[in-house]
Amino acid sequence: MTTQKIVPTKSTDGSKLFRHQAKFVAGAMNINQIPNFSLPEIAFVGKSNVGKSSLINTICNNKNLAKVSNTAGRTRQINFFNLADKLIIVDLPGYGFANVPISVKEQWGVLISYYLRNSYNLRLVNLLIDSRRGIKENDKKVADLLLANKREFQIIFTKSDKVTDHKNLHDEAHNFLATLNYSCNVMYVSNRSKEGARELKASLAKCIKPQK
């Protein structure tokens, strides 16, 4: 990766794909339970309570698809959702401030790390950052892991309706990516206002296999 520039997102249309109903197909609480669907996978990763499950529900137009809780650490396994037999959406457990025993946190860390390192079908990782909190040390460690394993990722600032000025976030992301010597999309999304949903869908739709 040689460029330090943030590449803006182009709003190509992903709405056709996301008109289809996504469905839960598997959950994995340990590495032996991780399935292989032979379909492209896109993963959502971020700190506990950053809004991963809510965002998945928003882009899939189904508020009951991924279980949502105000309590950090409720997603305790990797959840897999099939979208129209074209794409697998992967909801990873949160890292950081989950109010769970250290042994459980370590188990989640192993599970998340193993999946991100070894998934053959993983095409894109969405690194979710709470707009109110900014990029933290744990987020940087995940980005380092992704780069070390040559995983493509994009930064998604969630809860963008909670902040009035995106410039500071933009500058923070720019500086962060410069230190990584990496270029990627940076998006701002809100489950409440639906800001950024169209752009995010478009970026995910690009990961599906082309029709032969």
Swiss-Prot record:
Give the protein's cofactors: Mg(2+)
Task: Note the InterPro entries from the entry.
Answer: G_ENGB_dom, GTP-bd, GTP-bd_ribosome_bio_YsxC, P-loop_NTPase
What CDD domains does UniProt report for this protein, alphabetically? YihA_EngB (cd01876)
Q: Which residues form a coiled coil?
A: none
Which residues are listed for Mg(2+) binding in this entry? S53, T75
UniProt xrefs under PROSITE patterns: G_ENGB
Q: Where does GTP bind?
A: 46-53, 73-77, 91-94, 158-161, 189-191
- A single BP term in Gene Ontology: division septum assembly
Which UniProt keyword terms apply here? Cell cycle, Cell division, GTP-binding, Magnesium, Metal-binding, Nucleotide-binding, Septation
The Gene Ontology terms for molecular function here are: GTP binding; metal ion binding
Q: Which residue spans traverse the membrane?
A: none
Any idea where the EngB-type G domain is?
A: 38-210
The family database entries (SUPFAM superfamilies) matched by this protein are listed as: P-loop containing nucleoside triphosphate hydrolases
Cross-referenced Gene3D superfamilies: P-loop containing nucleotide triphosphate hydrolases
* Biological function: Necessary for normal cell division and for the maintenance of normal septation.
Family per similarity comment: Belongs to the TRAFAC class TrmE-Era-EngA-EngB-Septin-like GTPase superfamily. EngB GTPase family.
- Write down what this protein is called: Probable GTP-binding protein EngB
Which organism encodes this protein? Rickettsia peacockii (strain Rustic)
Print the organism lineage.
Bacteria, Pseudomonadati, Pseudomonadota, Alphaproteobacteria, Rickettsiales
